[in-house]
Amino acid sequence: TEQVILIKKTDADNYTSAEDFSGVDVGAQNASLQMNLLTSQLPDANPITIGDLGVGVLELQNGSIEALAVAKGNAEMILDSNPDLMICPWEFEVAAEYEANIILITKGETALLNVVNEALAKAYADGLYGTWYEDAVALAKSENAAEVSVED
């Protein structure tokens, strides 16, 4: 999936390249793909660990951080209820091994793993995965957008 950086719209001209993040406080969730990308692709930025995206949005809006690294799907949900923010034109480069979602299954649960793999193979073959993803994003926007808004 695409990984992006959220910034304030008022800072749009300040962040157009990786170099623009030198010395900048950029938030990302601890032990996340975004934190890994942040530290590897923006080595001169100051990585700031955030507990969750709602806190990260608040920190971005109040100036505690200047940017927030998130998955693009999350960014789109955040933007729905925070019109003062935008996606930075510069995006992370994501290696192929990080582009897929994962499912965690307890080690040794071979029967469950086989059922899950069969269901996923059928979903991909039938072209359902893309529509499921779009439906999930729409549902998440409707139920979770308010959680990351400071409009309350």
Regions found by a protein language model. Give the residues of each.
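Hydrophobic residues within well-ordered alpha-helices
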Residues: F21, L60-Q61, V116
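Alpha-helix capping/helix-boundary segments
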Residues: L33-Q34, V55-G56, N74-A75
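Short secondary-structure boundary segments
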Residues: K9, N30, K72-G73, K107
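Periplasmic-binding protein-like
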Residues: T1-K9, D80-L120, L139-D152
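Flexible hinge/capping segments at coil-to-helix
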Residues: I7-V26
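Short helix-initiation/N-cap motifs at beta->coil->alpha
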Residues: D13-N14, N30, I48-N62
